[in-house]
Amino acid sequence: MTNIRKTHPLIKIINHSFIDLPAPSNISAWWNFGSLLGICLIIQILTGLFLAMHYTSDTMTAFSSVTHICRDVNYGWLIRYMHANGASMFFICLFLHVGRGLYYGSYTYFETWNIGVILLFAVMATAFMGYVLPWGQMSFWGATVITNLLSAIPYIGTTLVEWIWGGFSVDKATLTRFFAFHFILPFIITALVMVHLLFLHETGSNNPSGLISDSDKIPFHPYYTIKDILGILLLILVLMILVLFSPDLLGDPDNYTPANPLNTPPHIKPEWYFLFAYAILRSIPNKLGGVLALVLSILILMLFPILHMSKQRSMMFRPLSQCMFWILVADLFTLTWIGGQPVEYPFIIIGQLASILYFMIILLILPAISLFENKLLKW
């Protein structure tokens, strides 16, 4: 009798993706983040679904409905904080996943990589709109500031902003549509994830050495299923420690004040995972220039396959490139810190220098070092 796992039209797809998938024998823990992101997405969709059952997307009742969830709904506080901190875990995994791709040259699978960058944009858009929903002070002013950036687009800017707002300011119409988009986007993300995996399984996984591993493959199950389960348990452990011991650690106290259009908070800043991009935005004195830099700071990831000058794929055997990679990581930490600071000396100049360094490392220094390493190896 033939195995149903290998013959059934639906189960067969799952089999080829998660069970009999040939995987390189030497992929490290850095390859765990794909599955962890999948788990994060599932957690976010499930907790979000239960929150949506009790949330009302109306300016008069949104803030109260979130309070009601935390106080009156059974385990509502748990669902709410799992959703809020789940977003932070999502972005930690995302940044590590992208960083792994940069370090080991996974961007040479350019279809997979480009879908990944689109996914990053989609997740960032979803997180931004989700942050607006509790309708606290930072929700309202964050939405006002970020949507207002679109007015920098020449000719159509102002019309575009008013069209997105559904009026002349962030109001009831804006909140309702943000809730609608925040609800639908995770399902679009799920579809994109499937495309991401489809492209990945066309080529197979990369590995730390960056060499072709066709001659040494092992089945995904049981080797990598058990490894993924360990990663998932650690992810849930960290998430639950965050949720149960310090749920507000990564949030902003201003968001516990209901939105008030007549009172601007002293420091408007987004959630921690957007601070690096926010710092790049603020480091340019011109509005349109800042918006372009903001978009390019993420879009620049799509240039990595073109900017790859080395004859080797991975950075595993390239110490000079490794050094530059870690300087880039340190630079991103610096930008994240600056994004949370007020706009005054010395933070302004530090932010500007860190922004220049960010683009210089990616566009000039890394490709130049790669060419130099080729020369050193007489390639």
UniProtKB/Swiss-Prot annotation:
Note: Heme 1 (or BL or b562) is low-potential and absorbs at about 562 nm, and heme 2 (or BH or b566) is high-potential and absorbs at about 566 nm.
CDD domains from the UniProt entry: cytochrome_b_C, Cytochrome_b_N
GO cellular component: mitochondrial inner membrane; respiratory chain complex III
Required co-factors: heme b
Major location (coarse): mitochondrion
Organism: Tamias canipes
Record-listed a ubiquinone binding positions: 201
Gene Ontology BP term (one): mitochondrial electron transport, ubiquinol to cytochrome c
Name the UniProt record assigns to this protein: Cytochrome b
Keyword tags: Electron transport, Heme, Iron, Membrane, Metal-binding, Mitochondrion, Mitochondrion inner membrane, Respiratory chain, Transmembrane, Transmembrane helix, Transport, Ubiquinone
